[in-house]
Amino acid sequence: MGGEKAFSFIFLLFLCFFLANLSASSAHPPRQKLKQRIPCKQLVLYFHDVVYNGHNKANATASIVGAPQGADLVKLAGENHFGNVVVFDDPITLDNNFHSPPVGRAQGLYVYDKKDTFHSWLSFSFTLNTTMHQGTLIFMGADPILIKNRDITVVGGTGDFFMARGIATIATDSYEGEVYFRLKVDIKLYECW
């Protein structure tokens, strides 16, 4: 009888060890190296945002359309602008010069959505109308403004960019108080039709 108990114990121990290994190996399959994808199209563009401040109506390309209670629609609210909604119709250029000929328009909105730091949520389109590119690209995503380079998604497009998808790396290229900023937008499309 003692031999049977020892055999049963060893068999159960072996079975538990085997099942534990089987479970662990199926829960964590071996990692495969991700295939490095090459963009099918890449563009670098700049858009220039001039926020209306009550004194620059002729040059303003953006306006505050929503503000927290007690704030006005001329000046951005509070320390981190939490609750402000800004719509824009900004020129897009091929270089960082505000006075360069525009190749299109950036149109959409951004919402300052964090109380404790500069952070916004973006939803906008680039409408391009040049000999090189005709069509639109649609962008959406969170923008942690204080980070130098941040990624937002390209969720679609029309014309030359029909059903395009990819990533846009944005960086604040210039910033002049609460009135003007320029974003460098490095667009990498991974789905092109």
Swiss-Prot record:
Broad class of where this protein is predominantly found: secreted
Superkingdom per UniProt: Eukaryota
Subcellular location: Secreted, Extracellular space, Apoplast
GO terms under biological process: phenylpropanoid biosynthetic process; response to jasmonic acid; response to UV; response to wounding
Annotated S-S bridges: C40-C192
Technological use: Combinatorially expression of Sinopodophyllum hexandrum (mayapple) genes of the podophyllotoxin pathway (e.g. DIR, PLR, SDH, CYP719A23, OMT3, CYP71CU1, OMT1, 2-ODD, CYP71BE54 and CYP82D61) in Nicotiana benthamiana (tobacco) results in the production of the chemotherapeutic compound etoposide.
Pathway entry: Aromatic compound metabolism; phenylpropanoid biosynthesis
A GO molecular-function descriptor: dirigent protein activity
Signal peptide positions (record): 1-29
Glycosylation, residue list: N59, N129
Description of what induces expression: Transiently induced after wounding and by jasmonic acid (MeJA). After an exposition to UV-light, first transiently induced before fading out.
GO CC annotation: apoplast
Tissue: Expressed in rhizomes, stems, and leaves.
Keyword annotations: Apoplast, Disulfide bond, Glycoprotein, Secreted, Signal
Sequence similarity: Belongs to the plant dirigent protein family.
Subunit relationships: Homodimer.
Function: Dirigent proteins impart stereoselectivity on the phenoxy radical-coupling reaction, yielding optically active lignans from two molecules of coniferyl alcohol in the biosynthesis of lignans, flavonolignans, and alkaloids and thus plays a central role in plant secondary metabolism. Also involved in the biosynthesis of etoposide, a chemotherapeutic compound of the topoisomerase inhibitor family.
Protein's recorded name: Dirigent protein
Organism: Sinopodophyllum hexandrum (Himalayan may apple)
Lineage, uppermost ranks: Eukaryota, Viridiplantae, Streptophyta, Embryophyta, Tracheophyta
